A protein has these predicted regions:
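Conserved glycine-/histidine-rich ATP-lid loop and adjacent helix of the Bergerat-fold HATPase_c
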Residues: 128-144
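Glycine-rich phosphate-binding loop
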Residues: 116-133
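A conserved short beta-strand within the histidine kinase catalytic ATPase domain
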Residues: 75-83
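Short, highly conserved beta-strand within the GHKL-type HATPase_c fold
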Residues: 81, 87-92, 147
Length: 161
């Protein structure tokens, strides 16, 4: 396994773009979709489905840590270990915020009620992340540990059907 990229940021929404930038670039290392706009090489391009899934799931979990574990208070930190390989991306987030019971998150009822245009409350971010990832685990702490894993889709082998 490759050496992880390590980053520690304050556990607030203000620092989310910093963490997202690093995660997006790590995803691009795995997907090999590093498209650079010659006019602005710093523009974040996450059009590749792998990159989009990783960034979307990561943002949901980061939001949960900042909003729920740290209760929107300053002072907490989020430690990231991001490990890109040629087949997958593994992201570990550690925080010392308030733990919670992941197993207690009820599955969402996504049946449409055409008379109600509101989104379900509670668990939406967890549902989104689980849907986007191949694996997601959570171990309450301290420290709390999230482990997110996204694998590249299998590529067909030449000469096989």
């Amino acid at each position: 396994m490759a050496a992880p990229i390590r980053l520690t940021v304050p556990g607030t929404l203000r620092y989310r773009p910093v963490a997202v930038r690093v995660v997006a670039e790590a995803a691009r290392l795995v997907s090999s979709s590093a498209r650079v706009d010659p006019k602005d090489p710093l523009v974040l391009d996450v059009r590749d489905p792998f990159d989009t899934a990783v960034v979307s799931a990561f943002m949901e979990i980061y939001n949960n840590v900042a909003i729920h574990a740290y209760q929107r208070r300053e002072g907490g930190m989020i430690e990231l270990a991001i490990t890109p390989t040629d087949r997958e991306l593994v992201i570990e987030l550690r925080d010392n915020g308030r733990p919670f019971d992941l197993e207690g998150v009820e599955p969402l009822d996504l049946e449409l009620d055409h008379g109600d245009d509101s989104l379900p409350e509670g668990g939406m971010g967890i549902h989104i992340a689980k849907t986007m990832l191949d694996e997601m685990t959570y171990h309450p702490g301290p420290p709390n540990l999230w482990r997110l894993c996204k694998r590249l889709a299998s590529q067909p082998v030449a000469g096989r059907s």
